[in-house]
Amino acid sequence: MPGAFPLVGTMAALQEEHFQGADMPTIDPSLRPGKVSKWGEWVKSKPLAVNGVETRWRILGKYDLVSTNEDGTIGLIDCKVSDSQRDTGQFYSPQLEAYAYSLENPAAGKGQTVASMGLLVWKPTHAIGTSVDDYGFGVFQKYIPIERDQENFLKVIGEFITVLEGELPEPGAECATCNYLLARNALN
């Protein structure tokens, strides 16, 4: 998605770089003692199970920040540069739960317990600088904790996999895509 919005990738990279090695309580006092120890790494889960049966489906994603906490757990932070009202825990919960699932159930290696997850939002508020060489943006920073809800995440992803693996429904007369595919397949 950052390719569609060129500055999003640049701003996200600046935000991630800024917090490399940061003490978690300096990001937000509500966070457990620890330090940001990883950033921008890919995670891949073991195969997901639906109704106790292993599927061919896995989760693959790239998180922004992970902390190693003093109590042996980890924290997960997704960085956002935005002024959107949708920057809420509810909107981003599935994304963070997917990363958390992958960290706790990795395809290889030992899983780690994700004790906290949240959004670190930078909202640009003003321009700063006094010369051509040092202009920038000031931001309002807000940490938004996201409650873990792995049970709901696994339920929704299970329903999604069931649809993907299920029988294809009969095409409807009003479905333009269905009609196109039927006509296209008839050419073969």
Give residue spans per PLM region.
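Conserved active-site beta-strand-loop modules that form the wall/rim of enzyme catalytic pockets
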Residues: D64-V66, G72-C79, A115-G118
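An active-site-proximal "capping" alpha-helix that borders the catalytic cofactor pocket
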Residues: S93-P106
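Metal-dependent nuclease catalytic cores that hydrolyze phosphodiester bonds in DNA/RNA
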Residues: M1-T73
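Short alpha-helix boundary/capping segments
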Residues: D87-P94, P145
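Hydrophobic, Leu/Ile/Phe/Ala-enriched alpha-helical segments that form helix-helix packing faces
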Residues: A22-T26, L103, A107, L164
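Short beta-strand-loop-alpha-helix junction that forms the active-site gateway
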Residues: C79-T88
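A generic fold-level signal
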Residues: R58-L60, F91, E170
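Metal-dependent nuclease catalytic regions and adjoining charged, substrate-binding loops involved
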Residues: P106-N188
